Amino acid sequence: MARLFTPSESKYYLMALDAGTGSIRAVIFDLEGNQIAVGQAEWRHLAVPDVPGSMEFDLNKNWQLACECMRQALHNAGIAPEYIAAVSACSMREGIVLYNNEGTPIWACANVDARAAREVSELKELHNNTFENEVYRATGQTLALSAIPRLLWLAHHRSDIYRQASTITMISDWLAYMLSGELAVDPSNAGTTGLLDLTTRDWKPALLDMAGLRADILSPVKETGTLLGVVSSQAAELCGLKAGTPVVVGGGDVQLGCLGLGVVRPAQTAVLGGTFWQQVVNLAAPVTDPEMNVRVNPHVIPGMVQAESISFFTGLTMRWFRDAFCAEEKLIAERLGIDTYTLLEEMTSRVPPGSWGVMPIFSDRMRFKTWYHAAPSFINLSIDPDKCNKATLFRALEENAAIVSACNLQQIADFSNIHPSSLVFAGGGSKGKLWSQILADVSGLPVNIPVVKEATALGCAIAAGVGAGIFSSMAETGERLVRWERTHTPAPEKHELYQDSRDKWQAVYQDQLGLVDHGLTTSLWKAPGL
């Protein structure tokens, strides 16, 4: 690709728009992958009265917030808009946007929208109860988070919107459209709709036909890193970017995060530790799990897919524990000028591996086909205050997060026959040195910690640079820009101890699921349609 910019002539930068579940960020990077500035705003999704589980995406307000973030990032960076060489967008997966035939966005929902539980149940009954299996084999997705039941819900309950709908995209594509006026989706994000074929990396309209839904709403598919268009004059006035700035196709947050971590080759493995924890393994060719426990998504690297297992609310559980039980530690940490989690890890380091047998019951390993969890609890507590205290419970939570990750990675190995030799640990969880070491000890693998731990925006910026002709290859650039802070090596004796802890936890968790099944306790989370 011919260069649109010549970086040697002046100082150019790249902008990434990162639309997460709870916030929107505009992040500016230099061409060496260094973060220069950020603009950020929280956003909230709208629960519709009398529509249980609904979480609509506020298109008008959220576009205003995105524009404010872009202006804020430019201001904080102290650079003129003409030095932004290109912009791209990434977003939470599963969130969808519908447009009418004039190109006006008319409806959107966030990834957490769970209104279509009844529709999921109805769809599962199609084709003699084989429809979900057919969707999974083709797309790597089940119906729980798919766009298909949401579209069916609109057909049932908001036929006015359903009839008007002319095009569907993801939220990252909506941001790019608002900037450029060009509509397209990329495989990595659109793959989470349950409508995109893993092998062809293109839509599979037959799935909509099978569900009795319209198949004429599917937008063009373009690979991540493709030049989509340029910032329009109208958008430039609102967001502060220069009209004519290249707008590049972005992608899904996890896949672009892996690009930013240099996880771009077959068999490379990452654990992304945020609100949810994703365990991701790169597969050289599309293959799905016969047990339907693991989702499979297109990578942003063409031809490659990612097996992904998800631990539910891992980071959120830690935050709950800190806020509910550690007010004293928060005050002490503030006086010491350190993070509360750092103080808790220092306290926890004196607790022996295995946490005196305490077993947290929060997220289960991923069971994509029948995805639900036990009621949150701690099992096997002691009334000895020297053995059972805040430090013990905190370590038990860190160990349990690592155990669930190891279970999820084992599920991927079982069907893919890929056994990684190491893994990358990123996201907020990787800031904890003890937690990183525990993950190494539990998994039995060396754990590499990057300097840039929140790598999604960096991966998005790399895509922008490829689309502008600044970088020649996403994979090579991702590998070149990633820098490593430290490596944690597993201790064999601790790994053996944790294997025993893992076996006991799995047996206890299965019993706890039985309490939910009998209506005696309330699940941490249950997928729509169960």
Swiss-Prot record:
Gene3D superfamilies: 3.30.420.40
GO biological process: carbohydrate metabolic process; quorum sensing
The keyword Transferase is assigned to this record: yes
Catalytic activity reported: (S)-4,5-dihydroxypentane-2,3-dione + ATP = (2S)-2-hydroxy-3,4-dioxopentyl phosphate + ADP + H(+)
The keyword Kinase appears for this protein: yes
Keywords for this protein: Cytoplasm, Kinase, Transferase
Broad EC category: transferase
Protein name: Autoinducer-2 kinase
Lineage, top ranks: Bacteria, Pseudomonadati, Pseudomonadota, Gammaproteobacteria, Enterobacterales
Gene label: lsrK
